[in-house]
Amino acid sequence: MTESLWHERRLTEEKKRRNDHRSPYQRDRARILHSAAFRRLQAKTQVLGVGMNDFYRTRLTHSLEVSQIGTGIRAQLKQKRPEFDHLFDSMSLIESLCLAHDIGHPPFGHGGEVALNYMMRDHGGFEGNGQTFRILTGLEPYTEYYGMNLCRRTLLGILKYPAPYSSLYRASGNKPVNNIRQLKPSQWTPVKGIFDDDSGILDWVLEPLNGSDRERFLSHRDLGANKHLRTQFKSLDCSVMELADDIAYAVHDLEDAIVMGIVTPSQWQQDVASKLTLSHDAWIKEEFTNIGQNLFSHQHHLRKDAIGTLVNGFVTAIDIVEDRAFTDPLLRFNAGLDTSFSEALEVLKQFVYKYVIRKPEIQMLEYKGQQIVMELFEAFESDPERLLPTHTQERWRESHTKGLNSHRVIADYISGMTDEFAARLHQHLFNPKAGSMIELNGEL
């Protein structure tokens, strides 16, 4: 592993700041934490709609919790497998990845993502992870053209799906809808990968890899007829971040649902406890199956203790796994969850999906956001030089003049909006009784 290559940035920096002894990844963490894109996560949907309740988690609080879990995974791996400690760099690297992992997600969660993907169906598609990569490498104005100008290893770590859109896309056979209100998200699932517009940056990130490692890292698997292809591999750092994200999603979104009365003890018993009693792991059978009483307790401290038990159970069940087909240690080794705990985590994720995400009230909010995003896109696409903000107009005009993908500029603008801003902008454009646009001008 050539450390100096992984520390490289696309734009060489010669900043001389007095007594600045920070590591490269401490600098990356600071850039992410202080970015406008990160701050906007405070007003973007996690699972429950922004404004439904003061307790719920937003994308921002979710990202902070993912960072906490990610550093916990890193710390316990250091203790459990000290022989692999040299593979990990600064703790700030894991923090950076966890804080940044959701930066590209559009307003209104999955509804906004599907909406933008549909509107971009002939222009390279849209997907939140691809947009995260795009923000970090080009859009966030820390530099003029290179985004946050993060280290190569940080960018490698953010690549959950490391392959270009065009190599993964498979036509579904679905025809465009006659009316956008008829759009079914299941028919327009986004490709999980990097936009072709950014494939040159992906090439730069992967430069230190040898030919066989690169080819295997970019390879994909078939998920079945009419489904997009899916990448198979990720880096060591990314594997830690993804596990932290999965644990936070399953456990903390479950907590939101319990507190807000969306799920009941009987549903827990039927869909979770009954399945976990069949686990091959004695600890899961004993602890997880009997935790329901505390999870649903009206005593706050008992519920928090139960949540902590769940998180700790998953974090301490993570170990290092090896894939000897790779040469580079950053690809050869990944963090992996014990099989029994992986199955238990999947049970929790499916429980949240069934009783929370698929709940009609949540789906109505998602559907409304879907319509808002598509109607905004239609409006801006109809006359970009009239309706887009001045700075975005300039980007659109430059892209259009150079024969580049000018539709991507519109997707960039809308995906950067918060839920509230998108809703108010939609009101100003389409509601005759809405007030002046002036108060919106300085927000994005």
Curated annotation (Swiss-Prot):
Name the protein family: Belongs to the dGTPase family. Type 2 subfamily.
Q: Which PROSITE patterns match?
A: HD
GO MF term set:
dGTPase activity
The record ties this protein, via NCBIfam families, to: antiphage_dGTPase, dGTP_triPase, PRK05318.1
GO biological process: one example: dGTP catabolic process
What SMART domains does this protein's entry cite? HDc
> Which controlled-vocabulary keywords does the entry list?
Hydrolase
The chain positions of domain HD read 59-250
Q: Mind telling me which Pfam families this protein's record contains?
A: HD (PF01966), HD_assoc (PF13286)
Sequence segments annotated as region (Disordered):
1-26
Entries under SUPFAM superfamilies matching the protein = HD-domain/PDEase-like
Residues making up the signal peptide according to the UniProt record = none
Q: Indicate what this protein is called per its UniProt record.
A: Deoxyguanosinetriphosphate triphosphohydrolase-like protein
Report if keyword Hydrolase is assigned. Answer: yes
